[in-house]
């Protein structure tokens, strides 16, 4: 059956399953092209109910308690808006277009509340290092376009390796543990929707691990 995930063989029929790794400033038109060309029955997105709620009710962001994750998001958003861009435009566009086209949606990211709780376990030294990097980012004349170019022209593995070396615990909670969470969510959707065309939008940093785990690009 097309689109069937074979747990035993850990292989994936790629005819009906497609994973798109995006950077979080991706143009709306790029997302739309992926959706229109693949014509999915279901779209799985690296979002959670908490993020959807904040998308629909921006004032909720103001009521959030202080967190380093929130500070990072606020800092990037501020710089992005100055350049006429929107942080998270890729996933937001995928969600909104799926709604407009009446395509079934699956949210696969770990709830934001849980991520923030786990993040408290990060050592103070790494949090300070992250805040220092954030301060440099805010003060520098780095443009969002420069960041996009670096992401598009640098091996994702190299970028992840740098983060892991500098902040191993942050890397675990932001990347590794979320990879595992999303893999399990995706497998559940694939098992429950065999034969359906499923399009999956995730950040580039998660793409390789998830594809490898699901058996993409493996010889049968």
Regions from the language model: what does each represent?
Residues 1-220:
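Compositional signal for N-terminal targeting/processing segments
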């Amino acid at each position: 059956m097309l689109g069937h995930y074979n747990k035993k063989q850990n292989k994936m029929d790629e005819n009906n399953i497609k994973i798109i790794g995006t950077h979080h400033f991706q143009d709306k038109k790029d997302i739309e092209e992926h959706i229109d060309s693949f014509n999915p029955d279901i779209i799985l997105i690296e979002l959670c109910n908490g993020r959807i709620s904040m998308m629909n009710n921006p004032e909720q962001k103001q009521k959030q308690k202080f967190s380093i994750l929130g500070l990072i998001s606020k800092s990037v958003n501020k710089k992005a808006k100055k350049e006429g861009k929107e942080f998270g435009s890729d996933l937001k566009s995928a969600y909104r277009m799926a709604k407009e086209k009446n395509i079934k949606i699956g949210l696969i990211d770990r709830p934001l509340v849980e991520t923030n709780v786990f993040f408290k376990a990060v050592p103070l030294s790494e949090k300070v290092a992250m805040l220092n990097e954030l301060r440099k980012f805010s003060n520098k004349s780095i443009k969002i376009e420069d960041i996009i170019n670096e992401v598009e022209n640098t091996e994702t593995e190299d970028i992840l390796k740098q983060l892991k070396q500098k902040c191993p615990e942050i890397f675990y909670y932001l990347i590794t543990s979320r990879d595992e969470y999303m893999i399990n969510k995706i497998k559940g959707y694939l098992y429950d929707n065999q034969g359906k065309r499923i399009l999956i939008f995730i950040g580039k940093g998660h793409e390789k691990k998830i594809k490898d785990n699901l058996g993409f690009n493996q010889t049968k």
